[in-house]
């Protein structure tokens, strides 16, 4: 095995002789503070609050009037119907996907609220919600919930590449991003 030092015996002896009487320096100039847990808890708490706020709009008792013939679709009154046509043609490609398979109605509402909050926070305009076929509970409820939310501009049955009739493409109203003003 090769030794780690490349110094000769003389150099090592000289070094030891010069180091006689020295002691290790105690590091006392920099105080290391422990990491605070509050820093990581605040964003988590804020995210949970955003989800709760966003899912507040979803009611099982209110039934918005949606067209029951043809593919599932909805457009808010102040939004052009041309947006539905663009969604149907596949002009929009979703940046976020939400899979509701296996969730309860309560969990699905919370996840929908979280999706809408995340889209607004990240300035994402189009998302895909996959409700699946299943027992048709989430398939029937998801459009009713989405139509109640004020930040949902429109939704349409997804094109085949995004899930077809087991998914919805959703357009979310996002605030325009403004760069910070310089002083």
From Swiss-Prot:
A GO MF term: RNA endonuclease activity
Keyword Membrane among UniProt keywords: no
SUPFAM superfamilies: SMR domain-like
Alphabetical keyword list: Endonuclease, Hydrolase, Nuclease, RNA-binding, rRNA-binding
Domain Smr: 98-173
E.C. no: 3.1.-.-
InterPro entries (UniProt xref): Smr_dom (IPR002625), Smr_dom_sf (IPR036063), SmrB-like (IPR022990)
Gene Ontology biological-process annotations: rescue of stalled ribosome
A Pfam family of this chain: Smr
Oligomer status and interactors: Associates with collided ribosomes, but not with correctly translating polysomes.
Alphabetical list of PANTHER family matching this protein: DNA ENDONUCLEASE SMRA-RELATED (PTHR35562), UPF0115 PROTEIN YFCN (PTHR35562:SF1)
Biological function: Acts as a ribosome collision sensor. Detects stalled/collided disomes (pairs of ribosomes where the leading ribosome is stalled and a second ribosome has collided with it) and endonucleolytically cleaves mRNA at the 5' boundary of the stalled ribosome. Stalled/collided disomes form a new interface (primarily via the 30S subunits) that binds SmrB. Cleaved mRNA becomes available for tmRNA ligation, leading to ribosomal subunit dissociation and rescue of stalled ribosomes.
HAMAP family, A to Z: SmrB
Family under the similarity heading: Belongs to the SmrB family.
Protein name: Ribosome rescue factor SmrB
Gene that produces this protein: smrB
